[in-house]
Amino acid sequence: MATLGGGCAFQIPNLQKQDGQTKPQRVKISAAPQAMIAIPLRQLQPYGFLDSEQQEWVLSLRGHPIPFWVIDDEQPHLVFYSPATRSQYWRENVFLLEPKADFIRSPDPALVDLIWIPALPTGVLDHLSNGIALVTMTMEENQIYQALSEGIHWFWRKLQNNQEQIITMLIEDEPLSEVLLRFVLYSATEAPAQPDHVLKITVNDSFIKEIFWDGKGWQQIEVSIPAQSIRAGKNQLTLFVPGLEGVFAQLSFLERIEVFYPQELPPQADQVSFLAGGNLQEALMGYDQTQKWLWRIDNALSPEQTKPGVALSIDDVRRYLWVKEKGFRKASKIEPLQQLSNENSHSSEIAYIAIGTGELLKPLQPLLELRQAGGLTVTTIEVEEIYDQYYGFAEAQALRAYLAKAARQYPALRYVLLVGDTTYDPAQYITSAEMNRLPTFFIDTIYGGQTSTEIPFAIIDQDNLDFLDTLATFEPSLAIGRLPASSPQQVRQWVEKVLAYEKGEKKPKTKAILAIADPQEATFERDATAFLELWKGQTSIESFFPNAGETSLEQEIRGRFDRDYRIIAYFGHGAIDLWGKDEIFTAQQAKELDGQTSYPIVLNFTCLTGYYIHPEVLSLTEALLWNPKGGAISIIAPTSLTLADDQSFLWKALVESYQSQPDGRIGDVWLSALPKIALANEGIRDVVLTYTLFGDPALTLP
């Protein structure tokens, strides 16, 4: 395997003991899925891994031990199989390699659902015989996000009326007979006509076929392509959506194409997976096992290196992976696991934790010092340290597991500030790492499809996330605040605002409450009036209820921010970056606010204004937070579409909680409000799940 040398340019740590020997250290390995990986031992030796000691080490995937081999040649390599996994949080698998004495078996019960294995094609036995295998491959790219699809939300290509999509299909060897293509797609439209969808498939301009189906939802459609229409190498696959009589629009999203084609054994490709039945001895007789390897991968977590002479019935179909010397894939990253720096360094009095990347936590320091001086015992933790304690993946579930542990370790823990932006693309298919600093949870809602929720971080006494759909009320243990920052500058400017507020410079001097109603519907004015009625006799109240069609509403609302209100509450239609169908106040206008007397708390009883997970659109919430000269100090806003009647349960609970602790903190209001809301229907549940507290949960109330 000398030709496998080179590997990747990994940073090599200095782990030498005083006696000159290498101290074993736990290692995190990132690798592409659905591939056999080889790592030169010289890249692992600095961490203490030696060929002679391989039995003293454990390789694991999400707590599940994974078999590995040391293939010893001129340059020995550690070899293991990286199975196909599917998660919205990652593109690559993360394996932990650690001394056996350090390994704690804790397999993730959800791992079996993360492993993906393509279904056998129709009539698979018709394609197999002694010496003939069915090569399998999957073509997909996650390029298009669709919140409203069911289950899977990432797609490769959009298929719509009179538009053409061209895909290059690479076939390693000329197929012996027909090639089977399985199209997996999601249809987003439907029509009374039957069928209401058609797709014209052309291969190399020599094969044309139209396929039809009916209705919305997922489709798996298999198409057989004659062998003479396919060539070894690049093939052009053209997809076109013709018009259909009685169908105004057709819209589908292609998720993947699974390819199956018969090939004579042994395979010619450097690394290829295939289906085969029967005894492979005759077909593979005489192959040089020192340069080619064969694994059975029916059990993706426990592949077996096999020899072709194993007796199997021709009807006993197995999955294999064939690898030549040059076919092994490389690991993309090898790095030591980080330990929790604050594991034993703080007392049980900790009441406030800030979590984020080191880069974003640094400018947060003045705020943490203020909270410490105000009587809260504070600590911080870098998010990478958390990931490395829980399987190594950058996922929200790791943060939740840590918070559950922290709550047991620190009984006084009450406030958690999550410092970092994220998007609906945490795996970074189409976005950057800067946009995905700290992940969140995703749920499916009634009207808006998939969106974010922070509730699982707050409720940590439940073993899994089933409680999101089953509990009659939510009783959070922790007040979670999200600061969706993507840069240190944003954190720094926001901290300066909070300091000015807490020191009294920008804290509202009056107790006035302002309610703004969208003029488009009478129900919004009704709700805003009812909201203000709850404050009567306790504080001064004001309303701004313009008439539909009025001009200059944006200037009117900007003027309201210049006044001294402790709370500004909006009731009405909304979108990610604005209030009102008529755009009565937008994110751009929020960015331009300047010279405010004070910074209010802003409550949004609308839709989507807290949808901070969009990678391209700045939400109204973010615009109000990041404005260094104005805007809001804390915001409660939704990441979803919900109904005004369902939102009313939230604003009633918030007012009651606020009034019961006027000298408390915004996080205290949030914690006491949620249990007051009976989750009587899915709409109310969506409201509670998707409304988010933005800013510091320990902010003192104005």
Pin down the residues of each PLM region:
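Cysteine-dependent hydrolase recognition
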Residues: 9-702
